[in-house]
């Protein structure tokens, strides 16, 4: 129970849970629509890259508007990256599983090119990283002495919004029918093509938002270690939570405890990371 013993440890648990929950919420839209987006990790990375680029443009005189701009840049970065998968599936019937998965490695290569090249901090002792973002660009924190940010509130608000969308709106019903039963959807006047695009763009936008919150929050700069596996772990979070907005809140907390427990096992017991 070490991850919940102290306020600081609880804050670290929420730091891990926030990106997992946000990405899982987007993936739930995909999976409920029978669209298999396996590349949320790549969309997370591209959201971090575009958000990081926006943050690097800021200086000490930049206004508070920069934080919404960073988050919007992250959302758009993730949506564009997921849109590539949607386009190839829509126009050429390419497998979204393979395309989205391969784009993960392309996104990581883009990140590495930037932090080893044009965005590398000249005062960073040759380490592959950007300069630390200005304080004005950092996501506000919820507790003093903790890294827990308002990203947690965004994640919880997203969970509530998804519940309303899926179970209380006609658009949410059409989204699920369009993916799960294309023939029935066409008969009812719903578009399975629209369901594909909405699912991937929402999922990509959520992953990109998580990436933006991560680099403008706990990390505070771009490094090669931004890809932390959250995009893949969120698939587990989504299914353990049974693709339900409330269930995924609890599964995200469970997965976060496993993350932190694994890190403690590595540092204190010397267990290899592969275990």
Question: Where are the predicted features?
Answer:
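Transmembrane helix-bundle core of multi-pass membrane transporters
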Residues: 3, 7-8, 96-168, 221, ...
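Transmembrane alpha-helical segments in multi-pass inner-membrane proteins
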Residues: 201-275
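Hydrophobic positions within alpha-helical transmembrane segments of bacterial inner-membrane proteins
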Residues: 25, 29, 48, 71, ...
């Amino acid at each position: 129970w070490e991850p919940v013993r102290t306020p600081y440890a609880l804050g670290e648990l929420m730091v891990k849970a926030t990106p997992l929950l946000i990405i899982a919420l987007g993936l739930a839209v995909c999976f409920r629509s029978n669209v298999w987006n396996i590349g949320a990790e790549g969309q997370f990375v591209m959201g971090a890259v575009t958000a990081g680029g926006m943050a690097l443009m800021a200086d000490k005189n930049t206004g508070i508007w920069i934080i919404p701009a960073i988050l919007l840049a992250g959302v758009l970065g993730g949506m564009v990256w997921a849109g590539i998968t949607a386009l190839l599936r829509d126009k050429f019937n390419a497998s979204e599983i393979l395309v989205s998965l391969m784009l993960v490695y392309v996104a990581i290569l883009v990140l590495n090119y930037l932090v080893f090249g044009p965005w590398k901090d000249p005062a960073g002792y040759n380490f592959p990283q950007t300069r630390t973002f200005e304080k004005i660009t950092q996501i506000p924190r919820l507790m003093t002495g903790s890294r827990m940010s308002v990203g947690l509130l965004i994640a919880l608000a997203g969970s509530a919004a998804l519940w309303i969308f899926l179970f209380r709106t006609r658009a949410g019903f059409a989204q699920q029918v369009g993916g799960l039963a294309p023939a029935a959807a066409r008969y009812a006047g719903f578009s399975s093509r629209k369901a594909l695009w909405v699912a991937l763009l929402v999922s990509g936008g959520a992953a990109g938002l998580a990436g933006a919150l991560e680099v403008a929050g706990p990390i505070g700069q771009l490094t090669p270690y931004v890809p932390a596996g959250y995009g893949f772990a969120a698939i587990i979070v989504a299914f353990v939570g049974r693709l339900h907005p409330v269930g995924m809140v609890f599964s995200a907390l469970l997965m976060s405890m496993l993350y932190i427990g694994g890190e403690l096992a590595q540092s204190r017991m010397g267990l290899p990371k592969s275990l």
